[in-house]
């Protein structure tokens, strides 16, 4: 599995405004309270569920799992360095919310099918699974040419993943989370150099530098776009 170390490190995704907007979206779709048990698969630094914990005043810390352990993890969460399939092989907890935000595409298709079957077995009776992926059509992320090519290939695979989810959970609910991004170009260039998205991970440094030059020429100093995510909501009674 690929490790994305900087997706939530000094990006709009780590901003208070984004996290508040994201958590507002989640809570609009699923009622949670201080007794709720929450799991975030691929939690990164855990800022999203950490903030959610404070907002709900959770009795028990939300659990975040990831294959990368960051030194600056949110202290409001309980963290385990483990992959999802290994975690569920021994887990006994029934969760009210399982969150998978922009990480399911890092698994191979067989692993995804196994994970989807395991998820419902680890939900409470009224629990929900939220799976977020990038918008697969007309995606507006600022890109350079090679990044765009790789992103389109990745989004094509995401469509396959969404079809697999629909086959296993035919009554799933589909929503969209849209966040209006406004970022200074030099900050976005740093994100590119830090390989904030999986499509950049395997690119040689030479191609990254070319891409930085291309984006620097292509975009204005203040970059504005809509960051769109597809949210698939699954429940226990399928």
Regions found by a protein language model. Give the residues of each.
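A conserved beta-strand element that flanks and buttresses the S-adenosyl-L-methionine
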Residues: 99
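A short glycine-rich, Lys/Arg-flanked "PGG" loop and its adjoining helix->strand segment in the class I
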Residues: 113-125
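Conserved Class I S-adenosyl-L-methionine
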Residues: 173-238
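Conserved class I S-adenosyl-L-methionine
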Residues: 1-33, 47, 51, 130-156
């Amino acid at each position: 599995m690929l490790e994305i170390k900087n997706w939530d490190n000094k990006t709009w995704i780590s901003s208070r405004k984004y996290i508040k907007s994201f958590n507002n979206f989640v809570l609009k779709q699923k009622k949670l309270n201080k007794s709720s048990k929450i799991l975030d698969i691929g939690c990164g630094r855990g800022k999203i569920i950490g903030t959610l914990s404070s907002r709900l005043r959770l009795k028990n810390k939300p659990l975040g799992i990831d294959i990368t352990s960051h030194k600056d993890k949110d202290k409001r969460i309980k963290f385990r360095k483990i992959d999802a399939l290994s975690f569920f092989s021994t887990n006994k907890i029934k969760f009210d919310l399982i969150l998978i935000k922009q990480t399911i595409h890092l698994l191979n298709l067989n692993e995804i099918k196994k994970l989807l079957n395991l998820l419902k077995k680890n939900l409470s009776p009224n629990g929900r699974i939220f799976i977020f992926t990038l918008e697969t059509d007309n995606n507006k992320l600022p890109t350079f040419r090679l990044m765009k090519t790789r992103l389109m290939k990745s989004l094509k695979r995401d469509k396959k993943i969404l079809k697999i989810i629909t086959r296993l959970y035919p009554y799933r609910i589909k929503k969209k989370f849209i966040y209006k991004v406004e970022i200074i170009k030099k900050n976005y260039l740093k994100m590119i150099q830090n390989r904030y998205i999986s499509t950049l991970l395997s690119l040689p440094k030479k191609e990254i530098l070319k891409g930085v030059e291309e984006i620097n020429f292509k975009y204005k100093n203040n970059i504005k776009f809509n960051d769109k995510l597809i949210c698939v909501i699954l429940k226990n009674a399928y």
